[in-house]
């Protein structure tokens, strides 16, 4: 099953997440099909905290991809801000 979820990057104690489309059987930070955005939970000042390609996310959801709870909340925030 294809899912849209967060893949962790960044350094120790400084997380940075890529929003990726992947097979649910793959490891959290493993192989993915497409990168559709990023989330920086510790962004400050002028740094961009969230960027999502909503068109591509809607495309994948239309094809039957499931969305993780956290990514669903991020999509909701992005739509509210836009």
UniProtKB/Swiss-Prot annotation:
Any GO BP annotation: translation
Keyword tags: Ribonucleoprotein, Ribosomal protein
Domain of life per record: Bacteria
InterPro entries: Ribosomal_bS16, Ribosomal_bS16_CS, Ribosomal_bS16_dom_sf
Recorded GO CC terms: cytoplasm; small ribosomal subunit
MF-aspect GO terms: structural constituent of ribosome
Family annotation (HAMAP family): Ribosomal_bS16
NCBIfam families for the chain: S16
Family statement: Belongs to the bacterial ribosomal protein bS16 family.
Name of the molecule in the record: Small ribosomal subunit protein bS16
Organism per entry: Serratia proteamaculans (strain 568)
Phylogenetic classification of the source organism: Bacteria, Pseudomonadati, Pseudomonadota, Gammaproteobacteria, Enterobacterales
Gene of this entry: rpsP
């Amino acid at each position: 099953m294809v899912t849209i979820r967060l893949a962790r990057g960044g350094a120790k104690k400084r997380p940075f997440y890529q929003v990726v489309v992947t097979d649910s059987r793959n490891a959290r930070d493993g192989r993915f099909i497409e990168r559709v955005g990023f989330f920086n939970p510790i962004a400050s000042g002028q740094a961009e905290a969230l960027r999502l390609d909503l068109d591509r996310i809607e495309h994948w959801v239309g094809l039957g991809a499931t969305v993780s709870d956290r990514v669903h909340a991020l999509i909701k925030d992005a739509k509210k801000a836009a």
